[in-house]
């Protein structure tokens, strides 16, 4: 059953001679080498000042409540309502102890609803975003650089450096060379062997990043032989994780005993994952192969070159793992290096058929961000079919406000994750950023969401930042890649934000969000006088439309880059009008 709202007046957008009417609002990098600039605003219905506006027509989505607990809907959101111009009400299917850090996440950034209606259908918003943030995009020269200019109408503190330029290289040595030569002002993820050179150079500064991440080896449990739990468990016992961390990770990194880092509340409840036990691994592998009627395993080790805090040297670590699988377990592998965007899309679609190297960096410090996204009911096809017992335990943890109940739920969930082995948990990697010493305000965020507007690049008018890869798009409602999220965060803002360089959720486009006594409803009061970079006024309908475009899989603005919108079901439990399961 579809849930479609009545149409508010301001979402009728004229494009040429045709009137396109949208109910409410619902990433590939640009393919050419031509610079992409901010689109003209003439195609967007002009906004009017609040004092001159017609009576405000707040909208609700969906018009009737979402069918909480009724298949096929598995989501946790019941309804979003613009009760007036500056108030939005979120009705939930069950309490959500992580509501505030969720709505602070940049994936849930707010867009001008008229702009979405005009530019989502043709996907032009992927490369030319509008937002309320401290910067606007002035140019995207595909394959080379992404340029930002300070937003002259920004409601908050103006950017200290007028321009920011993003560049990228997947080679740590190249990033360091650019920093040392002075062609860039800051870099992400210096190589483990380069940190000493940075800290020993008075002209540079290293900022350490807390290891709120996890590196893992994943399997699709619907594909043989990974459908056999004994084989998955044998690989978990047959990998020497200590050797990997010691040889390839920077100081401060840890062997991971749990999928969620221990500095996240409730992260390390229950039993630690399997340790290195070669004899037990060989015995289990033999049993599993006998059950499958096979005598050997040959597969691909699938990965991308993108450096991350959880994976500091992908080719070297992949080579090490391939060697261990061969030497320890007799599993022969072929290294399969894939393009980053295609790799992530294949992971989301559940089409990676080998052992894949991936990881996760925290978006907010709660187990729901790590566990629900990967193993919950709305986690999708990344690891094949979700395990119902794991999903049930996670549902309890995600919907209880009682700490003892949450703790017990995560004990159960972690024990079941250990037993089922959807992935081999390997490492929590330390990482950091490095800047020229004269860049004031430089920092490394534990969430990898560095805020460039608070940095002053000496006496220069442009701060040049070099990260690991090019963004996939600048509409992050349909992205999961950290390089894309960081790029979006300079332009788009969410209802809440995170403190600079930290993890605490603080007011953003909302001055406050307050829960009802039973925590079934959150009421958010919006900041008045905020405008988007296209000149449109920010109001409550923009919030409803921005969320609806992600929430409803049948929404006309549910477009994005790949169309996967992975974060929504991973963090909110499921889509409204979900697509049928893949055959």
Please report, for each region that a protein language model flagged, where it lies by residue.
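N-terminal lobe/hinge region of extracytoplasmic solute-binding protein
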Residues: 128-132, 466-517
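Ligand/substrate-recognition segments at binding pockets and active sites
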Residues: 286-362, 465-468
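Long beta-strand-rich cores associated with HINT superfamily self-processing modules
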Residues: 433-463
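Extracytoplasmic/peripheral linker and loop segments enriched in polar/acidic and small residues
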Residues: 49, 63-81, 245-246, 327, ...
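Structural transition elements
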Residues: 254-288, 305-316, 452
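Surface-exposed binding/hinge segments that line
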Residues: 48-113, 525, 556-583
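Aromatic- and charge-enriched surface segment that lines or borders ligand/interaction sites
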Residues: 44-57, 83, 89-91, 175-178, ...
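Ligand-site clamp/hinge motif
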Residues: 105, 123, 151-197, 527, ...
């Amino acid at each position: 059953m579809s849930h479609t709202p009545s149409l508010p007046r301001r979402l009728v957008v004229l494009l040429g001679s045709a009137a396109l009417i949208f109910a409410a609002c619902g990433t590939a990098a640009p393919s050419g080498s031509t610079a992409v600039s901010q689109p003209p605003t003439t195609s967007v219905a002009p906004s009017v000042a609040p004092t001159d506006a017609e009576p405000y027509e707040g909208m609700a989505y969906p018009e009737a409540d979402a069918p909480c607990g009724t298949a096929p809907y598995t989501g946790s959101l019941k309804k979003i309502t613009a009760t007036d111009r500056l108030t939005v009400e979120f009705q939930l299917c069950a309490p959500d102890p992580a509501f505030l850090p969720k709505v602070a996440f940049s994936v849930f950034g707010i867009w001008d609803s008229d702009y979405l209606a005009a530019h989502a259908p043709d996907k032009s918003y992927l490369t030319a975003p509008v937002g309320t943030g401290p910067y606007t995009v002035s140019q995207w020269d595909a394959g080379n650089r992404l340029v930002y200019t300070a937003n002259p109408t920004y409601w908050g503190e103006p950017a200290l450096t007028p321009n920011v330029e993003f560049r990228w290289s997947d080679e740590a040595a190249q990033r360091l060379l650019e920093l040392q030569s002075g062609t860039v002002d800051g870099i992400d993820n210096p190589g483990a062997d380069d940190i000493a050179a940075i800290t020993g150079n008075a002209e540079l500064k290293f900022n350490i990043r807390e290891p709120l991440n996890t590196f893992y080896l994943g399997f699709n449990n619907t594909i043989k032989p990974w459908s056999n739990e004994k084989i998955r468990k044998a690989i978990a016992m047959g990998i020497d994780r200590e050797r990997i961390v010691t040889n390839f990770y920077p100081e401060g990194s840890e062997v991971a005993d749990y999928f969620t880092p221990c500095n996240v509340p409730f992260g390390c409840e229950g039993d630690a994952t399997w340790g290195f036990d070669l004899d037990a691994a060989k015995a289990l592998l033999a049993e599993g192969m006998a059950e499958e009627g096979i005598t050997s395993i040959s597969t691909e080790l699938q990965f991308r070159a993108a450096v991350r805090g959880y994976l500091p040297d992908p080719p070297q670590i992949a080579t090490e793992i391939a060697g261990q699988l061969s030497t320890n377990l007799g599993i022969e592998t072929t290294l399969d290096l894939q393009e980053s965007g295609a790799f992530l899309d294949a992971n989301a679609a559940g089409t990676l058929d080998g052992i894949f190297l991936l990881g996760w960096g925290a978006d907010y410090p709660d187990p729901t961000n790590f566990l629900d996204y990967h193993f919950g009911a709305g986690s999708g096809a990344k690891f094949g079919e979700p395990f119902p017992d794991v999903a049930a335990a996670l549902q309890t943890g995600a919907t209880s406000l009682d700490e003892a109940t949450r703790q017990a739920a995560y004990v159960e969930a972690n024990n079941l994750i250990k037993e089922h082995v959807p992935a081999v948990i390997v490492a929590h990697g330390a990482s950091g950023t490095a800047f020229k010493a004269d860049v004031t305000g430089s920092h490394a965020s534990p969430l990898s969401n560095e805020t460039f507007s608070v940095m002053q690049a000496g006496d220069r008018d442009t701060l040049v930042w070099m990260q690991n890869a090019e963004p996939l798009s600048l509409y992050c409602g349909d992205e999961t890649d950290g390089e894309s999220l960081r790029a979006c965060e300079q332009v788009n803002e969410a209802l809440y934000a995170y403190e600079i360089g930290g993890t605490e959720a603080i007011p953003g486009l909302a001055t406050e969000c307050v829960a009802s006594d039973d925590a079934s409803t959150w009421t958010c009061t919006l900041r008045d006088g905020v405008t988007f970079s296209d000149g449109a006024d920010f109001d409550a309908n923009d919030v409803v439309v921005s969320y609806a475009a992600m929430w409803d899989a049948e929404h006309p603005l549910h477009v994005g880059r790949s169309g996967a919108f992975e974060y929504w079901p991973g963090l909110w439990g499921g889509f409204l009008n979900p697509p049928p399961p893949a055959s």
